[in-house]
Amino acid sequence: MPQNPPQDFDPIAYINAPRWQASRLGLDRIRELLARLGDPQNSLRIVHVAGTNGKGSTCAYIANVLQAAGYRVGWFSSPFIERFEERIRVDGKNIGMPDLARVTLQVREHAEQMSAETGDHPTEFELMTAVALLHFAQVGCRVAVLEVGLGGRLDSTNVIAAPDVAVITRIGLDHTDLLGDTIGKIAAEKAGIIKPGSSVVSWPQEPEAAEVVEAAAHAAGCTVAQPDFGELDIAPVRHLDPERIEPGEPSVIRPFTYKGSEYETTLLGSYQPQNAALALEAVSALQRRGWDIPQSAIER
């Protein structure tokens, strides 16, 4: 592994530099950059999550279950809420600044060479994708949970080969200037993460989007699993005894039952149990593929 970076190198400032700021969809640049880095994504099992609403919480649920099951889990998300480092996590912990600087320097070397040799350069999100995948590979992650940044079909996270599971959250109108001005067009972009050999799990979409997702899955030889919200029973929010919780621990939980099993979430939006049910179906898809995920890990 390369030596520690110089103390005056600021990886966040480098990634956020104006030269990288662009929304140019396409996979050629990220493919080239990752090839120069040795294609670190090929060492990872992947859960790929696209959609308009609920991507972050769905990723969180899946990553937490896999970690509880004993997998070393990388999670790449966008955007961050409080700290830039939230975008790259391993086993629930943000990447540290020394690691972020070290890996960014490695990516910088190849990004600069690529720019000089080809006249083209990666975007900020492509740099981040490369940093995340390289870091996950270097620290020995077995699986990466990747949250799509924009769309899906041409998003830099779609540089991967077939994911074990492609998850599509609720689809709505978003980024219509880039993805299309109808639900159907946007659904086609989101469904672009579906590849032959993957399991597919989708939110129960409205008819126009559902038809597109089903068609994409059929073309790839896949079937689509969905959560059954008729088997979801959401209990009232419960406040915990403040004398029995540690500082920093959540004080409120939302219990729910899905398919006869009891769960709880500390994410309190009224829609969170539905996102959790979607994540549970993704975990079930992984179990059907032979992943060792005991029920005790799911209920934690």
Placement of each model-derived feature along the sequence:
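N-terminal leader/targeting and accessory segments in enzymes
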Residues: 1-53, 57-72, 81-83, 109, ...
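Short glycine/threonine-rich catalytic loop with a Thr-x-Gly-x-Asp
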Residues: 73, 267-280
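Acidic, Mg2+-coordinating active-site environments of NTP-dependent enzymes
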Residues: 114-116, 127, 140-148, 163-257, ...
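Hydrophobic alpha-helical scaffolding
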Residues: 23, 203, 269-272, 291
